[in-house]
Amino acid sequence: MTAAKIKVLCVDDSALIRSLMSEIINSQPDMEVVGTAPDPLVARDLIKRVNPDVLTLDVEMPRMDGLDFLERLMRLRPMPVLMVSSLTERGSEITMRALELGAVDFVTKPKLGIREGLLDYTQTIADKIRAASRARVRARAEQSAGAAPVAPMLRAPLLSTEKLIIVGASTGGTEAIKDFLTPLPPDSPAVMIVQHMPAGFTKSFAHRLNGLCRITVKEAEHGERVLPGYAYIAPGDSHLLLARSGANYVAHLSQEAPVNRHRPSVDVLFDSAAIHGGKNVTGVILTGMGKDGARGMLRMREAGAYNLAQDEQSCIVFGMPKEAIAAGGVHEVVPLHQMSQRVMAHLATFGARAQRV
């Protein structure tokens, strides 16, 4: 007996985009478009009729604001939503807000008239729809419940060995990273993060986090020193690596080929942390689709790092953590709301502030 196809409803005010999305989705053997809508009001009626598994939603819509529609949808009828965003500053800000409201993930709008690259784009959309269809989606009220307590400051004497927190995430990771970073104290060791995200969105992501956290959050720059009390987000379309300059840690950006079909890649960051950080590293792998980071986390463990993975129950998609656990790179499996505390508790076992200034 063949498995039922993933039912997709496409909502976009552009007839051309609706047509292209339908063509892409219907070309896949395991999914089909069961309806299209030019605006959220039409979509609202269609949802009741066709009961889709996944909704693709344009971030900027007529008649009803896309964010208003998403907020109501996640409160009244939670379902996996994949945002389709334009590559603009306004588009990236709206997309970040949509992810906060409960959207599972986003894709950028296809470049119309450019058939080259459409194959890669087709694969990306298909993969994200598959991941969305398996995502754990909760009502909004449930998502905001049980905020993590503030992690304790590290009050022990300074140690000459500088500690680092190295993080990888994908689908569902923007909110997971926020939940992980916000409890960290101002004297936290430096945090380096790869979140799968295209160019043009990571700066907005870092800016939004910076306004919420007690540490400074920024998009990583090539050659800058990696300092305690800072979190560095890998820029979209660039690998982020840990490097050394004398006794100091520095950020290194690379345009080398994608790894595991991703640039930035979690494995690339984790591999560099294994080489240059070793036992000074605490590794964290959060919600995400695929296996990026699994091999790198094992290499970090073999180099002396202590690694934690988000548990299945709190993941939007239990892909990357599951693969890292299966590969043998993980010491602890932890619910997201306890992750910051567990990381800081582990660092406290060093009996040191875990940083050098």
Curated annotation (Swiss-Prot):
Pfam families: CheB_methylest, Response_reg. It catalyses: [protein]-L-glutamate 5-O-methyl ester + H2O = L-glutamyl-[protein] + methanol + H(+); L-glutaminyl-[protein] + H2O = L-glutamyl-[protein] + NH4(+). Its main location: cytoplasm. SMART domains: REC (SM00448). GO terms for biological process: chemotaxis. One of its GO terms (molecular function) is protein-glutamate methylesterase activity. Its EC number is 3.1.1.61, 3.5.1.44. Phosphorylated by CheA. Phosphorylation of the N-terminal regulatory domain activates the methylesterase activity. Residues 7-124 form the Response regulatory domain. GO terms for cellular component: cytoplasm. Keywords: Chemotaxis, Cytoplasm, Hydrolase, Phosphoprotein, Plasmid. The modification 4-aspartylphosphate is found at residue 58. It is found in: Cytoplasm. It is an enzyme of class 3 (hydrolase). Involved in chemotaxis. Part of a chemotaxis signal transduction system that modulates chemotaxis in response to various stimuli. Catalyzes the demethylation of specific methylglutamate residues introduced into the chemoreceptors (methyl-accepting chemotaxis proteins or MCP) by CheR. Also mediates the irreversible deamidation of specific glutamine residues to glutamic acid. Belongs to the CheB family. Contains a C-terminal catalytic domain, and an N-terminal region which modulates catalytic activity. This is Protein-glutamate methylesterase/protein-glutamine glutaminase 1. The gene is cheB1.
